Amino acid sequence: MAEIKSKVTLIGAMLARPGLEFIYEGELPACEQCKVRKACNNLKVGRKYRVLSIRATVHGCSVHLNGACAVEIVESPMVGLIKADLAIANSRILPDLSCTQSECKSYPLCHPDGVVSGERYMVSEVLGNAPDHCDKGRSLKLVELLPI
């Protein structure tokens, strides 16, 4: 398996700590006039990231209290449920996010934070059976997904 490449971005200095996981939500209107906005907004909207390390560089920021801090990040794996027949380690899948039964106990794992509709992921590990049953009666497996 290929090693995950890290990249440098800027996040709020008060948030910056190793291990922090976050979902990038996109650029804010307040960022339009910022001279370092490209460094802050160099991530993919909806993706989940994890901070590996913090750099000493801090920039003034109209969005974040105490400025924006340079951090090294990687895309973070997501844990979710997929159809059992797709749960094969190292396979590439397109997660099915079509279920609308939000009252189902499995719904949050069928729609994990950081999984973007229409994008492909690699099943990095099959973790086991679904912790709860599916209201639609589907056979599901709990897996770890990595963006590709």
From Swiss-Prot:
InterPro entries: UPF0179. It comes from the Archaea. PANTHER family: UPF0179 PROTEIN MJ1627. Belongs to the UPF0179 family. This is UPF0179 protein Mpal_0949. It comes from Methanosphaerula palustris (strain ATCC BAA-1556 / DSM 19958 / E1-9c).
